[in-house]
Regions:
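Short, internal strand/loop/helix patches
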Residues: 116-120, 129-166, 170
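Short acidic, S/G/P-rich loop/turn micro-motifs used as interaction or catalytic elements
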Residues: 88-93, 125-126, 185
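N-terminal "domain-start" segment that seeds a small globular fold
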Residues: 24-27, 37-74
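Structural microenvironment flanking redox-active thiols in thiol-disulfide oxidoreductases
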Residues: 96-137
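Hydrophobic membrane-insertion alpha-helices, especially the h-region
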Residues: 13-34
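Thiol-/selenol-based redox modules, centered on thioredoxin-like
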Residues: 163-207
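Short active-site neighborhood of thiol/selenol oxidoreductases, capturing the structured segment around
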Residues: 73-101
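N-terminal Lys/Arg-rich, disordered targeting/topogenic segments
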Residues: 1-10
């Protein structure tokens, strides 16, 4: 009788190897800077507020583009995401946060390609207004999407309540782990968010 254990097919081995290569740096970034603060360099802290008690995987959100096409299940996979969940009107505070996210991403230089920005409008009408506020010529990387989910399963229901005009950070595995409530000192926000992102990008470098 042949008792040799069955070996996984080469394709599966390759998939598992790629999965490990991608996920381990992200997990290491969490471990060093958030789960085990004692491992950080002296004086290092994070600027944003960590999601308590732990990072939360995003649910299946029904997000659609201006043509009504679904964004796809892989929207939040493979990149760090700065997410803004809009209200019925993108007033001055809303616009300030979108411009802030642009400046932060630009400051990352070559690492900017590893970070995406998303504006989630509550409906198609608000999305159309947002497209006029944030034209592609000024915000070529900004993903503008409308939330078509049913009540109780929308982005606004998932992300932390009571934090209007906040920026939410989602990791490349699709977990919401940090929130940045707006502050009066926009320069402090710019420096603080940028510093957090640079730490995470450095610790999770995979290419």
């Amino acid at each position: 009788m042949n008792t040799t254990p069955a070996q996984p097919p080469p394709q599966r081995k390759q998939f598992l190897l790629l999965l490990a290569i991608f996920t381990l740096p992200v997990l290491a970034a969490y471990a060093v800077y958030f789960l085990f603060p004692g491992l950080r360099p002296t004086g290092t802290t994070n600027y944003g507020q960590l999601v308590a008690p732990a990072a939360r995987p995003l649910p299946a959100l029904d997000l659609r583009d201006a043509d009504g096409k679904p964004a796809g299940a892989g929207l939040f996979k493979g990149k760090w995401s700065m997410v803004y969940v809009g209200a019925a009107d993108c007033a001055q505070a809303c616009q300030t946060e979108i411009y802030l996210s642009r400046q932060v991403r630009t400051s990352l230089a070559l690492n900017a390609r590893r970070v995406q920005r998303l504006y989630i409008a509550p409906d198609a009408q608000t999305l159309a207004a947002a497209k006029a506020l944030f034209p592609p010529a000024e915000h070529p990387d900004l993903l503008l999407l409308a939330d078509a989910g049913a009540p109780g399963s929308r982005a606004a229901d998932f992300f932390q309540p009571g934090q209007p005009d906040a920026l939410y950070m989602v990791d490349p595995l699709g977990n919401w782990f940090m929130v940045y409530p707006p502050k009066a000192d926009q320069n402090a926000d710019f420096k603080g968010i940028g510093k957090d992102l640079k730490k995470l990008l450095n610790q999770s470098q995979v290419d």
